[in-house]
Amino acid sequence: MIALRQAAYFICLFATVSCGCLTQLYHNIFFRGGDVSAMYTPDAQYCQLMCTFHPRCLLFSFLPENSTSDADKRFGCFLKDSVTGTLPRVSRTGAISGHSLKRCGHQISACHRSIYKGIDMRGVNFNASKVRSAKECQERCTNNIHCQFFTYATKTFFSAEYRNTCLLKRSPQGTPTRIKVLSDVESGFSLKACGNSKIGCRVDIFQHSAFSDVDVAGIIAPDAFVCRTICTYHPSCLFFTFYTNAWKTDSQRNVCFLKTSQSGSPSSPTPQENAISGYSLLTCKQTLPGTEPCHSKIYPQVAFEGEELHVTFVKGVDGCQETCTKMIRCQFFTYSLFPEDCRGEKCKCSLRLSLDGSPTNITYGTQASSGYSLRLCKRGDSRVCTTKRTRIVGGTNASWGEWPWQVSLQVKQRAQSHLCGGSIIGRQWVLTAAHCFDGLLLSNIWRIYGGILNLSEITTETSFSQIKEIIVHPNYKISEGSHDIALIKLEAPLNFTDLQKAICLPSKDDTKPVYTDCWITGWGFTEEKGKIQNTLQKANIPLISNEECQKSYRDYKITKQMICAGYKEGGKDACKGDSGGPLVCQHEETWHLVGITSWGEGCARREQPGVYTKVAEYVDWILEKTQDSHGQPLRK
């Protein structure tokens, strides 16, 4: 099995551009050629983020400060494209290379929380103030409309005049114009993209209205909503004006003008027929239409022009969009319905691209439909949050890939054995129950297995993850059973496959959804005095109110940090060995990690529901603890 997986991986890496999510970072490797852009970034992870959001970038190489004697190339981030999906590899000490995350679903986020000690990220300094910490400086940057990144001089900075000074910065690209090593300073980026800004946002769309002010770019778009998304992800755009296809000036039709101003606000709008204006949504606190970096709408009787990447014949415009999404270089497409372009039920699907990711021209009134690739959608090709559904008593055997976030936590002492379950929530993070680590806090005794169905298939050749750090919730107490939650940081990022993916976290900001399709999974006992099961078990189970649950546990306190599930008559429940595993529920075609298997009286007893840690109550804690990870920050 492991040999087959490795073979598939190398075929994917070297032979095609239509593979799934590749998260590996290659140390001491530099990709030669294919350059489409270059900038300065503080680390390889931020370079990867820049590659992910660049319309042409598939690969990148990063040169840390100690990897080159050329001062102009230190902290250099080189974004690359390739027709074949790969580039020649050159051995270079210290260099780090990797792939765009365009195909990585839930990992696509512009949020980057890390604060870097000992480097000065240079740009245009436009504001200076005294603060007490780098975190406070980052907060000021996040709440300043123009600030993109910052540098904070600590209380031990060599110049007394600048100690505890917070410098807010910006640049045309949104990245530093240079990065220098400097003692006693800390630098980082605005957290606007993390939903942390207090500025607020305006979702108004102003019909027949144009903003003047300063144009920073002009990009072709089919409507004002695509224009708004483009503005949201442009480093300098604060608001926009879009001219429709009926605009009086031919050269400006379907052009999205991205704008800024010194004040941060537009001047008074000018009444203009066939002009539509609005604001960037970067400072919004919640996920709204336009804040996701993709466009799913299909435009009938519209043709998008651009560089021809590939032509194929498919059935239906949805099939054309799916084909475009699967081919990672494809940015947009046109599906022709002209009789001469059809062969039976299949018609011509033209896959296209451009330098900026937008059509070079748009034609209306044609027998065609057009749209964009969904490669940057959070529910994109990796299907992390939309996977078919995917201590279990009364359960049945699961199938391969049905619950790809489920992991087995195993302890290796005299013999190795399954102890708890857990859930993958990020490429370097697993969420489980705190009580799994009672008396077992040494990270080197644990092995974590993902992408497995049968425990008997684990051999000495089976790949596993090691633990870098165990983070138990600070309020967890063994004797009380509350706050039964722990994070595991893995030594190395996981490579997501059809058998191994992450589950989405619930949003603490959303109105409480009514979950009607909930499941528990695990390898635990199928009866109270049973044994660990070989095949992963699953059981469909209803949620019950905390008030109802409290009636069943009069000697215990059911807190708001807990959630209960089970049948009144019993029969299905989690049991020994399922602890730490997931309680997942489907809502609006998305699977969420609603609970963590925690405790209960016996297993599947009548009127004794299972008690689970309520994950929504801990989202802030999870984000706080994962923000300094070297993987993409978790964001919901």
Curated annotation (Swiss-Prot):
It is found in: Secreted. Keywords: Blood coagulation, Disulfide bond, Fibrinolysis, Glycoprotein, Hemostasis, Hydrolase, Inflammatory response, Protease, Repeat, Secreted, Serine protease, Signal, Zymogen. It holds the Pfam family Trypsin. Inhibited by SERPINA5. Its main location: secreted. Disulfide bonds join C21-C104, C47-C77, C51-C57, C111-C194, C137-C166, C141-C147, C201-C284, C227-C256, C231-C237, C294-C377, C320-C349, C324-C330, C420-C436, C518-C585, C549-C564, C575-C603. Belongs to the peptidase S1 family. Plasma kallikrein subfamily. This is Plasma kallikrein. The gene is KLKB1.
